């Protein structure tokens, strides 16, 4: 099992190598795809072989670096017919067009847009390809390193906030949490956003267990006695990121979890052996008033949480916050192909043994299974927009933001 979504060999700035984990093959097959050009980056993002707003921004940026490196080394003959490498203005103009092309791969995720704006500025301010390549390398390294550092901060911020909130309410028992889609290591440079909070909650729980924390090396995040005991990830139809990816990460980290269907949340809340006290979700775009675009199904989960008095948190770095768009009405929601709903992609299984069927290369066999009439019309939005009224807190690397007395978020301090 691998939780390394992006492999970036960067010891030699003039000869970097990039590959991404093909997440469409998980959880049964681990395969990395090399990235050489912007077109490669576009392809893996568009096909959702890589997904998650932070990871999309990183892979998109890395694909630009790889194409720039190839031009610089003259190792990619096909660039010669597209770029005039003897004319920097021509090269810069065509690279700018390539950035627009890359952005069209997943328009809802603001992280990619923000990264491409910064790269466009670097492109504008550099005088030749060598300078651009050098400054882009530094930018991408910083982007990756800060993402991982910020994820750990967000995880601890969100976990501590929840534990202290429960303590103030007089709750000091074991509890469970909900999450949707995948927001962990596979969606970021590591650790995760919403799943990062769950990781921090689990580490806190282990610190309070003398059978686990035998040497006292694990330190609790808060003085609260409550402990997260279980996680309920939603399967997240139609792409099943919850069942394929989040469940995969929870099993890898040995965090107690039970996978549930998207339609069983209310019944699970009423029957859970541990009271469900919070839901943590990620975000592809948070606009100025706190309205949040995230994986389809997030809005209905927020409505359910509000009905049952369960705290609902959005977890995202400040790079996911769009400080220009005033509210959710201005968010463009990507619609996916009908076949992604009418077909289910998975691994062929030996039914009785529940083990993968293998091909002649001893690799699991993937297949697409039809589950709906081919003639049926399909509406398949990739995201929905949760109004800020349904969100209790926005967890960032700089702290947890809550609403004021008038029910409004103020995120201006992040900019």
From Swiss-Prot:
GO annotation terms (biological process): L-methionine salvage from methylthioadenosine
E.C. code: 5.3.1.23
UniProt pathway annotation: Amino-acid biosynthesis; L-methionine biosynthesis via salvage pathway; L-methionine from S-methyl-5-thio-alpha-D-ribose 1-phosphate: step 1/6
Keyword Isomerase: yes
Coiled-coil features, chain-numbered ranges: none
Alphabetical list of HAMAP family matching this protein: Salvage_MtnA
Protein name: Methylthioribose-1-phosphate isomerase
Record organism: Vanderwaltozyma polyspora (strain ATCC 22028 / DSM 70294 / BCRC 21397 / CBS 2163 / NBRC 10782 / NRRL Y-8283 / UCD 57-17)
């Amino acid at each position: 099992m691998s939780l390394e979504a992006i492999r970036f060999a960067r010891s030699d700035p003039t000869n970097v190598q990039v590959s991404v984990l093909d997440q469409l093959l998980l959880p049964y097959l681990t395969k990395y795809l090399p990235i050489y050009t912007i077109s490669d980056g576009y392809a893996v993002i568009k096909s959702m072989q890589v997904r998650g707003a932070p990871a999309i921004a990183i892979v998109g940026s890395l694909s630009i670096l790889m194409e720039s490196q190839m031009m610089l080394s003259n190792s990619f003959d096909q660039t010669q017919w597209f770029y005039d490498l003897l004319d920097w203005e021509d090269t810069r103009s065509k690279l700018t067009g390539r950035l627009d092309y890359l952005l069209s791969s997943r328009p809802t995720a603001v992280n990619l847009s923000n990264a491409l704006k910064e790269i466009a500025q670097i492109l504008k301010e550099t005088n030749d390809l060598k300078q651009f390549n050098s400054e882009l390398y530094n930018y991408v390294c910083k982007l990756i390193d800060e993402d991982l550092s910020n994820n750990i901060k967000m995880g601890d911020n969100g976990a501590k906030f929840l534990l202290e909130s429960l303590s103030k309410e007089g709750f000091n028992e074991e509890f469970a949490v909900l999450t949707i889609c995948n927001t962990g290591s596979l969606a970021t440079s590591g650790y995760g956003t919403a799943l990062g909070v769950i990781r921090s909650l689990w580490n806190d729980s282990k610190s309070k267990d003398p059978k686990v924390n035998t040497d006292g090396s694990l330190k609790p995040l808060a003085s609260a006695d409550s402990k997260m005991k279980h996680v309920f990830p939603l399967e997240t139809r139609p792409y099943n990121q919850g069942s394929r990816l989040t469940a995969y990460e929870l099993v890898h980290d040995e965090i107690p979890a039970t996978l549930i269907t998207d339609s069983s949340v209310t019944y699970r809340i009423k029957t859970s052996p541990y009271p469900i006290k919070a839901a943590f979700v990620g975000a592809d775009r948070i606009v100025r008033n706190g309205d949040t675009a995230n994986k389809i199904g997030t809005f209905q989960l927020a409505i359910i949480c509000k009905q049952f008095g369960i705290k609902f948190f959005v977890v995202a770095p400040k790079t996911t916050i769009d400080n220009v768009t005033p509210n959710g009405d201005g968010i463009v929601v990507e619609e996916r192909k009908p076949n992604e709903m009418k077909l289910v992609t998975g691994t062929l299984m030996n039914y009785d043994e529940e083990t993968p069927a293998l091909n002649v290369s001893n690799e699991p066999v993937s297949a697409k299974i039809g589950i709906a009439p081919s003639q049926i019309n399909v509406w398949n939005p990739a995201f929905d927009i949760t109004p800020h009224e349904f969100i209790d807190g926005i967890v960032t690397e700089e702290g947890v933001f809550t609403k004021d007395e008038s029910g409004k978020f103020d995120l201006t301090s992040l900019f």
